[in-house]
Amino acid sequence: MKKHVVVYKKLAEPLLARLRAECEVTYFEAIDAGNRAAFAAAIRGAHGLLGASVRLDRELLDPALDLRIISTISVGVDQFDVDYLRERGILLANTPDVLTETTADTIFALILASARRVVELAEFVKAGCWTRSVG
């Protein structure tokens, strides 16, 4: 019997196909007021959850007696009551360091843009002032 996984974040179709090959999947591209009740009902029979950006509190997870793992597609775990998950024996997986290199790249790009006055000079060119010196 396949394990039941509830996905609550938009995923690329090839990833969903791989997951569906191994598991019974209930899929929500996003959670909102219109589908929150259906999401809560789906969680009740789930063995695993995969998603991000939705607060999964005790009230929502208490009825999920078969739940064994939650995997968040994010670095942070602030939307989870980690102590409660530990009490229940529910594993919590996240993606630590996934943004480390991107953050460093952004910082260096901002440093260079600031040092070379990129935004100021781009506005200068857009305004048609490129025929004179910036100084």
Regions found by a protein language model. Give the residues of each.
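N-terminal glycine-/charge-rich "phosphate-binding" loop or analogous flexible N-terminal tail
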Residues: 1-48
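Alpha-helix initiation/capping motif
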Residues: 12, 42, 117, 129-135
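Structural motif corresponding to alpha-helix initiation and N-cap regions
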Residues: 13, 32-39, 54-58, 79, ...
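Short gly/ser/thr-rich secondary-structure transition/capping motifs
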Residues: 28-34, 51-52, 125-135
